[in-house]
A protein has these predicted regions:
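Short beta-strand "acidic-cap" motif of Rossmann-like dinucleotide-binding folds
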Residues: 1-3, 250
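Residue-level recognition of alpha-helix initiation/capping sites
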Residues: 3-4, 71, 155, 237
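Rossmann-like NAD(P)-binding element
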Residues: 4-7, 11-75, 81, 85, ...
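Residue-level "edge-of-site" marker
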Residues: 5, 25, 93, 259-260
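Short glycine-/small-residue-rich flexible loop motifs, especially phosphate/cofactor-binding loops
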Residues: 9-10, 77, 161, 243
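Metal- and O2-centered redox machinery and metal/ROS homeostasis
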Residues: 15, 74, 231, 251, ...
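Rossmann-fold dinucleotide-binding core
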Residues: 48, 63, 69-170, 292
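Helical "substrate-binding/catalytic lid" subdomain
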Residues: 106, 116, 137-287
Length: 293
């Protein structure tokens, strides 16, 4: 193995991996036909492939197991064809628990090469945990939509738990003014729910139980108030790609789209738009923001 991060390389060596000092040394140390499996960020894949491919021979195999855009897979596969290097895209799901549970593998590439690699896929995945989804790009296309769905599920849990967290609104001191719709029947909202306990009970036999909910419950167990988090949610690209595919296919995907937009909102990207809204309300009706002078 080779990693540009000395810390990551040291950890892998301690687990029994054999290390190489450079990409050239890595490729040279492999038995023929050589197989190199990449696990790098999407932005680094092209440069990494160019480096590795310069040392590979016809008949060698290059597997991208990261979260690449499937359109890039189509291009890379064509670029490697003149060198007769086989390219396989593998969407890998399982997160940090994959080492214990096995990884879900969504595979794209030539049938004969995927068949040749089956012993590796079988070793990495749980039973029935890998699938040859189709030709080049198919694996990462399926993984892209998988991650889009993940965004939607996560948003649904977060919104539902937020409703529960706010179910004691009648106990809060809120001013009465012309700019805020009054809460009718405040006595209907006097519940102090224990969110960590609710996530725990939902895990057990509930229709909405899932591994994501298990992880949510674990997070609340470690930090019931989630004080370690500011709520600025990143997005690594797959959600955006899923929405683009939905638009190109003219397929409605309102839940997945809203979940991506909410991540933008969490990072303050709607602040200017909200100021514009407040300014318009003030101009047409003299409406001031709550707390403003």
């Amino acid at each position: 193995m080779f990693d540009v991060s000395p810390k990551a390389a040291t950890e892998l060596l301690q687990d029994g991996a054999k290390g190489a000092g450079s990409v050239r040394d890595l490729v040279g140390a492999l038995d023929k036909p050589r197989l190199v499996w990449l696990m790098v960020p999407a932005a680094a894949v092209d440069n990494t492939i160019a480096d590795i491919a310069s040392y590979m021979e016809p008949g060698n195999i290059l597997v991208d197991g990261g979260n690449s855009y499937y359109v890039d897979d189509l291009r890379r596969s064509k670029e490697l064809q003149p060198k007769r290097i086989h390219y396989v895209d593998v969407g890998t799901s399982g997160g940090v628990k994959g080492l214990e549970r096995g990884y879900c593998l969504m595979i794209g590439g030539e049938s004969s090469i995927v068949e040749y690699l089956k012993p590796i896929f079988s070793a990495l995945a749980p039973e029935h945990g890998y699938l040859h989804c189709g030709p080049s790009g198919a694996g990462h296309f399926v993984k892209m939509v998988h991650n889009g769905i993940e965004y939607g599920i996560m948003a649904a849990y977060a919104e539902g738990l937020n409703i529960l967290q706010s179910a004691n609104i009648c106990r809060r001191k809120t001013g009465i003014d012309a700019e805020t719709a009054p809460l009718r029947n405040p006595e209907h909202y006097q519940y102090d729910f224990n969110i960590p306990e609710i996530t725990e009970v939902w895990r057990r036999g509930s229709v909405i139980s899932s591994w994501l909910l298990d992880l949510t419950a674990d997070a609340f167990h470690k930090d019931p108030s989630l004080s370690a988090f500011q709520g600025q949610v990143s997005d690594s690209g797959e959600g955006r790609w899923t929405i683009k595919a939905a638009i190109d296919e003219a397929v409605p995907a309102p839940v997945l789209t809203a979940s991506v937009y909410e991540r933008f909102n969490s990072r303050g990207h709607s602040d200017f738009a909200n100021k514009v809204l407040s300014a318009m309300r003030y101009e047409f009706g003299g409406h001031r923001e709550s707390g403003s002078r």
